[in-house]
Amino acid sequence: YFRAKSNDGYHNQKTGFCSYFLTFEDGARIEIMNIPEMADLPKKIVRTGYSHIAFSVGSIEIVDALTAELKADGYEVISGPRTTGDGYYESCIVAVEDNQIEITV
């Protein structure tokens, strides 16, 4: 999704730690990490601290198509696609570990 390419990942057999880098066309990267011993406490969609990450995809058509693709793959769409009160065209989905992803033009 979001035209990111994943590396082959890293897995430390001794600790169970795993990580993947997602690299985007412009060179930006995000590292996704997991360690089995971490407590998975319930998360609310509205919360303090890290709440969501937004990706600008360039057009209304791409917002619509990507939202439909994610929904078809089983992700929960919690809003949109729509134009917000402050004029942004967006949708929001709930992704891995209940993290919210906002898809904007």
For each predicted feature, which ranges?
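Short, solvent-exposed beta-strand edge segments and adjacent coil->beta transition regions
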Residues: T48-H52
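Short secondary-structure boundary/capping segments
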Residues: F21-L22, P42-I45
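A short, acidic/glycine-rich surface segment
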Residues: D8, F17, P36-P42, S79
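Short, charged/polar surface micro-motifs in flexible loops or helix N-caps
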Residues: E25-R29, M38, I60-E61
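Core segments of cupin and vicinal oxygen chelate
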Residues: Y1-R29
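Vicinal oxygen chelate
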Residues: Y20-T23, I30, T67-V105
